[in-house]
Amino acid sequence: HVYLHKIGEEYKNDKKIFSDRRDKEEWPNVKISPSGRYLFVIAEKGWEFCNVFMKDLKTNNDWIELTTNVTGLFEIVPAEKHFYVKTNYDAPKYRIFKATYEKPDFENWKEIIPETKFTLESANIVNNKIILSTMENAISKLYIYDNDGKLEREIKLPTLGKVGAIHSEIDINYFYYSFSSFNFPKTIFKYNLDEKSDVKIYQTSTKLKFDDIEVKQIWYKSKDETPISMFLVHKKGLKLN
């Protein structure tokens, strides 16, 4: 169930606004637009199905069901004038759609970033830009797109590794992201969109001497000739034989 709670009021006064007569096995996730006007509920059922609903809190009209029994997962990323959808519907490695609040129905969604051979892991909106994190050959990549899905640039990461959590606000020109690797302790960076650069905010303290550790990515073929990626982590200068 989803309840509306107003800060400062007793929880007993909370009003149930979603889930009446819904499947008890559904798990609702909630997103709200920056203006606070449009509320989304993504009712997930397992890892294959979910239905997406939207409600205009200003007009208080009935819920609009944007998807109905569609095989796929949907993540709503609200922005000021549009909302974006990250989904694996007909795209196992995910893609991005763009839609308006005025015409939010599924048939009006426009694909702006198609599926590629790499997995799209996360999507964030920052100051009218789309920040995408992807997994490419077991390595994280970080990209900046404009709000229509045109690639602007790739953010250079410190080394081969994994991008973790990305935290952003829609109306500011920077965002935070975490990064770590075999020879790079977990670090939080602040990336400035205007300056096109990042600064280190925090790094996990450790006594290990990471400068003495070398990381290489190599490829080999499995029994059925499938290419397999493997990382070699060893002391710098070690002769491999």
Language model features: what each stretch is:
Residues 1-240:
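Peripheral, non-catalytic segments that deliver or gate enzyme domains
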